[in-house]
Amino acid sequence: MVVISIANQKGGVGKTTIALNLSFTLAEKGYDTLVIDLDPQFNLSFGILGMKLLDYADKNIGILLSKNSVKKKEIEESIIKINDKLDLIPSHLQLSAVEKMLVNAYAREMKLKNIINQIKENYDYIIIDNAPSLGLFLINSLVASDYIIIPCEPSYFSIAGVQLMLDTVEEIKESNLNPKLKVLGFIFNKYSKQSKIPQKRLEQLKQLYPNIPVIGVIPRTITVEKAEREGKPVFKFDANNPASVAFSELAEWVIENVK
């Protein structure tokens, strides 16, 4: 079982899109996959569940994290089966309030790890979607993860924000909260050949961090935007779309390189 965080402290880089598509694609390839929505904006949960998200006010990741101790049965009751191979623990409207409550909680950085440890034998992959900020939720996610994937896009501020994320990873490792945490690689999102800027930014990223691979380049397409609006993976719209192919290749890379 492998836990992977999709994280970047810069917003708008496509974390949720990548988390959703990677999770669905791994499941489509036959792997038991759980996606955890740890973002208070709950875009992933709302995209998949729509207004049904309101039905899970007492069964979501916020409720689990707010408890001093949580039983395996409570965790299992909060898991929503999306299909035969994909499960979801949703976010909710009140998740921001839970993060504030955690400030004074005992072993606050270990909350998510303790939850995952009770159910990890049920899955091949657990994917965590994170908020674009450094807070207790992101720290929990990094402490609970084996790997982190850092999405970025072809903008100066996105590339500059990568270093903030890498610094946070080093702090987590050096503090011994999770000394084995590894950066799996970058995903370059919203790539377009119609302008020289995306190509230039991609080369800058490779030059700045030669020891961290770019494990996926996701093209900017209208199909991705349509899929986002309906909370579906891109391959459900068009399996031959360049973005569908890119996400399939990303999943294959993860399967081959993460054990």
From Swiss-Prot:
Could you tell me what this protein is called? Uncharacterized protein MJECL24
Q: Can you tell me which family this protein belongs to? A: Belongs to the ParA family.
Keywords of the record, alphabetical order, are: Plasmid
Q: Does the keyword Protease apply?
A: no
Species of the source: Methanocaldococcus jannaschii (strain ATCC 43067 / DSM 2661 / JAL-1 / JCM 10045 / NBRC 100440)
Q: TM spans, by residue?
A: none
The question of whether Magnesium is a record keyword is answered with no
Highest taxon of the lineage: Archaea
Tell me which Pfam families the record gives. Answer: AAA_31 (PF13614)
